[in-house]
């Protein structure tokens, strides 16, 4: 709590800056300023009523005891006696660094008070650090907490000390900026995380888009490959040997209309005669398809003719000789049931293809 003194107190050294005597041996104290006020029984010595600037030893003491209540400075409006002013003049060299520290503490703490909008007379240990305890006291009065009613020489010294405190103030401002940047560390980290997440999201979306594009290109490439392979297959089919499924009547018809092209026919017919041997290792037999009959010949050059059963359906593949009216077979075997079922469909497909082929060949 702030201790207020009566204006008519016997204390005449208000406004002076005493020198603290810390870390020294115990001895009979001689007050440097004046005797304490007799009206205030709670005051034991002069050093209890004054707030000293932060010194290294004082900082260590506050770090050990952070929860001590702040000390307040009492100001007496009385005049300074001549004996005390002489002692103050002898201690000008000590007062200058003290005032420099006070100036730096003022520039540091006033900024924080302006930001937090707190009262200058209260202090909370949860809001501030222990090192700032005495700085708050010094900034409550600022330069006015210094000696009042000093002479012109003291005021000049204060001005000189303030001019020398400018670099210290700049350093303190730099430290304050670094501290203020360090205080909201969690928020800054969260913002950094959010920024990284936000920066990561478009990158992730771009990667997905690229993957989709690559997948699309791969699909297109596969389609192109499939199309090219299909075209190759078609070309192979175009260049490959085609067997024309036909009955006896249609075979004779296509052979008559397409004379310049070599055609290989496939017919399904019933064996209507016995197999007879012929010249040049040949065997002859007769095939019947409804009302139409067709003589066939098979030359046993590289293989023998398998055993054929009269009255059964056989599959014969070969070339038709229109001049001799004979079908030269290269393959003869019994037809399966599936071939017999699908043969009529094959004949219709072949008729359509042969009509298109003959129309194109006639235009050429």
Swiss-Prot record:
UniProt region (Disordered), positions on chain: 1-51, 70-189
Signal peptide start-end: none
GO biological process: fertilization; gamete generation; homologous chromosome pairing at meiosis; meiotic DNA repair synthesis; regulation of meiotic cell cycle; reproductive system development
GO cellular component terms listed in the entry, alphabetical order: chromosome
The gene coding this protein: SPATA22
Organism domain of life: Eukaryota
Entry's transmembrane regions: none
Protein's recorded name: Spermatogenesis-associated protein 22
Keyword set includes Cell division: no
InterPro entries in the record: Spata22 (IPR033536)
Keywords attached to this entry: Chromosome, Meiosis
Function: Meiosis-specific protein required for homologous recombination in meiosis I.
The keyword Ribonucleoprotein belongs to this UniProt entry's keyword annotation: no
Subunit structure: Component of a multiprotein complex with MEIOB and RPA2. Interacts with MEIOB. Interacts with the complex BRME1:HSF2BP:BRCA2.
PANTHER family (alphabetical): SPERMATOGENESIS-ASSOCIATED PROTEIN 22 (PTHR35258:SF1)
Subcellular location: Chromosome
Biased composition (Polar residues): 1-13, 30-48, 73-108, 137-169, 177-189
